[in-house]
Amino acid sequence: MQKDYQKLIVYLCDFLEKEVQKRGFKKVVYGLSGGLDSAVVGVLCQKVFKENAHALLMPSSVSMPENKTDALNLCEKFSIPYTEYSIAPYDAIFSSHFKDASLTRKGNFCARLRMAFLYDYSLKSDSLVIGTSNKSERMLGYGTLFGDLACAINPIGELFKTEVYELARRLNIPKKILNKPPSADLFVGQSDEKDLGYPYSVIDPLLKDIEALFQTKPIDTETLAQLGYDEILVKNITSRIQKNAFKLELPAIAKRFNPE
């Protein structure tokens, strides 16, 4: 079904306003990386909360300089208030203490450090933290638990990456951001396509069929292959979904023990 993106913008703005108000807040804060997802969330928040929507720019020691430039240009274009906190000194300490740390460990540390800054700012300014992860990332578990996946509310969490692109065009997100390869910018040379093995234009149709067909039952890879999807693609994507499903779940808490 073709989405009406102008109506979607109105819906998401209404969602943000009501959900923030429901939680007793008037201000919001979010991380702005210079990438597509955070740019979309930033513009939506600016539409609703104006000067009460604040962006944090948190470059690390390995962040690409052009990403910071793109974030600053977005703030200027849409009059977005922002604060910059460099996390480079902190990730340098981590690297010096854990010299054998993998790129994934370093990336996760940076993601969690950014979330620590966001929640500290939220406490200082009485603001609510807004998430910027899309549905493709969430289904694939392509994010850091208690890092970039952490938030109070998320306006784009049910939009696949390809849908976020379409929404971004309607919001007049700069072409520089629209055209850059998706990347979490967690280490030099990192990109979503390299990590996942496929572009979102290939992944998203499969994710949509998985959601439509297997919401209440285990994923059947044979059924997906019969729909015409490449078997290796199906195997890799379903494996990711199953391996990382726990990231979308609340912590399991033992029920109260009542001895007889």
From Swiss-Prot:
The lineage of its organism: Bacteria, Pseudomonadati, Campylobacterota, Epsilonproteobacteria, Campylobacterales. Catalyzes the ATP-dependent amidation of deamido-NAD to form NAD. Uses ammonia as a nitrogen source. CDD domains: NAD_synthase (cd00553). Mg(2+) binds at D37, E137. One of its GO terms (molecular function) is NAD+ synthase activity. Belongs to the NAD synthetase family. InterPro entries: NAD/GMP_synthase (IPR022310), NAD_synthase (IPR003694), NH(3)-dep_NAD(+)_synth (IPR022926), Rossmann-like_a/b/a_fold (IPR014729). Pathway: Cofactor biosynthesis; NAD(+) biosynthesis; NAD(+) from deamido-NAD(+) (ammonia route): step 1/1. ATP binds at G31, L32, S33, G34, G35, L36, D37, S38, T132, K161, S183. Homodimer. The gene is nadE. The keyword Secreted does not apply. GO terms for cellular component: cytoplasm. It comes from the Bacteria. Keywords: ATP-binding, Ligase, Magnesium, Metal-binding, NAD, Nucleotide-binding. Coiled coil: none annotated. Its EC number is 6.3.1.5. This is NH(3)-dependent NAD(+) synthetase. It holds the Pfam family NAD_synthase.
